[in-house]
Amino acid sequence: MRLKIENAMKELKETIPFRVRFSEVDSMNIVWHGSYPLYFEDAREAFGRKYGLGYYDIFDNGYYAPLVELTFKYKKPITYGMKPEITIIYRYTDSAKIVFDYEIKDSTNGELLAEGHSVQVFMDRNYQLVWANPEFYEEWKKRWQD
């Protein structure tokens, strides 16, 4: 029987502020839906830098981590000039994938504006799906156990 370590892992998250640019809004002055994946990408990159699970860390170990699932839900409009913040939260899984949840909040009052979820899988250098956790990823998870 394999022991789950989900509850034994530290909560890994990162929060970054961002400014809504004019090029990211539609004619109603509301953030265009296509901008949200970019905000999530910025959060994933910040998380990777902070915790040592960035794209180059993955590449340097001989793998790619393509995004295979991305969802988001709008709660309140985000408009031009706002300065929200996005929090990315790592979600442990035994599977060979990287799972994140996201929350975008108004930095002035903490109100939830949007939330999302993403899943990345591992592929080897021959673009073949990897079904077992790569060794470096298992080691990374162990590093963050309580």
Residue ranges and their predicted role:
Residues 22, 102-104, 120:
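Generic short beta-strand
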Residues 114-116, 131:
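A structural microfeature
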Residues 72-107:
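Hydrophobic beta-sheet segments that form the core/acyl-binding groove
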Residues 12-14, 64-66, 82, 96, ...:
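Residue-level preference for beta-strand/loop junctions
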Residues 68-70, 103, 117:
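Short, well-ordered beta-strand segments in beta-rich or mixed alpha/beta enzyme
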